[in-house]
Structure formats: structure tokens, C-alpha cells
Amino acid sequence: MFDYTVEELAGWKAKHGQLYEVVVGEGEDAKKAILRSPSRQDMSYAMAVKDPIKMSETILNNCWVAGDEEIKNDDQYFLGAISQIDAIMQIKTAEIKKL
């Protein structure tokens, strides 16, 4: 499984801001990836894709920082990872009131 140092993590955080660690599988078969939060441009590009799996794949590829390539290339790992994609697409709640 992919591993990283504290220094690498600090460098990635400085470059990308908020990061997420995604672990797919268990034990010796587990694979890990580091993803950054998607930008407005990432979201716009992904939303243009009509297929929900392709949309998640676009976000995964665009937000990929480092990790085990099997997550992108092996369907079982890929499907496990994209099931968690919503967690990195955090949106602030807003209010609107009539004046």
C-alpha cells in the first residue's frame, strides 16, 4: 500500500490545501490515495459529463495528488473509491431571505 512521509504531506497541503486520504479494501489488499478538494473548474468540467461514473472518474483524476494507481485502473478499487467521492465535494450551506 502507498505510504507517504510527514514532509510529503506538508508539501502537498501547502500546494493543494485541504486533502483527503481514501483507503479502499482491507489488510494487505488495501490501496490508498490522497485527493485534494475539487475546485469550481473541476466541478464544472465533471458536471458536463452525463454519465455518473464518468463524472466521478473525472473528479477522481482531477483531484488525484498521489497514491496507488490500482485505484484508478482496477474496477473493484475504482468503484470503492468513487463511492466516497461525495465526501470531498463539501459545499457550504447558504441561506436566502426576502427583504
Task: Tell where the protein language model's regions lie, with residue ranges.
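Short, surface-exposed, charged amphipathic helix/loop patches that serve as local interaction elements
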Residues: V24-L99
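Short, basic/low-complexity N-terminal boundary segments at the transition from targeting/disordered tails
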Residues: M1-W12
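Short, hydrophobic/aromatic-rich segments at coil-to-beta transitions
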Residues: A14-E21
